[in-house]
């Protein structure tokens, strides 16, 4: 868990072949800011007088962060229209994200997010 209130620690797990897009690594431990730009911009910016609007970090921001910082190839197999592609199951602390508000779920320090592809070639 993070000791800094400006950041949060998350455990990310990939399965069902989705890990192949993320350096073939199933488990990641990441730290993200607790407060993020309202436009989901994940690039590091310096604070200035005209700082952008911010909001608490949610799963939508996390998906953009994963795409911009951990995804190694084939973005189109991970995200579509600002969210995960159909066929990717998202669990938040072992609960289907549809029951948690999907992308609007506000992340908490120590959350575990699991993403599993349910689509397989044949």
UniProtKB/Swiss-Prot annotation:
Residues 33-48 have a biased composition (Polar residues). Its main location: cytoplasm. C-terminal thiocarboxylation occurs in 2 steps, it is first acyl-adenylated (-COAMP) via the hesA/moeB/thiF part of UBA4, then thiocarboxylated (-COSH) via the rhodanese domain of UBA4. Signal peptide: none annotated. This is Ubiquitin-related modifier 1. Residues 33-52 are annotated as: Disordered. One of its GO terms (biological process) is tRNA thio-modification. Keywords: Cytoplasm, Isopeptide bond, tRNA processing, Ubl conjugation pathway. GO terms for cellular component: cytosol. Belongs to the URM1 family. Acts as a sulfur carrier required for 2-thiolation of mcm(5)S(2)U at tRNA wobble positions of cytosolic tRNA(Lys), tRNA(Glu) and tRNA(Gln). Serves as sulfur donor in tRNA 2-thiolation reaction by being thiocarboxylated (-COSH) at its C-terminus by the MOCS3 homolog UBA4. The sulfur is then transferred to tRNA to form 2-thiolation of mcm(5)S(2)U. Prior mcm(5) tRNA modification by the elongator complex is required for 2-thiolation. Also acts as a ubiquitin-like protein (UBL) that is covalently conjugated via an isopeptide bond to lysine residues of target proteins such as AHP1. There is a cross-link at residue 122 (Glycyl lysine isopeptide (Gly-Lys) (interchain with K-? in acceptor proteins)). Pathway: tRNA modification; 5-methoxycarbonylmethyl-2-thiouridine-tRNA biosynthesis. HAMAP family: Urm1. It comes from the Eukaryota. The modification 1-thioglycine is found at residue 122. It is found in: Cytoplasm.
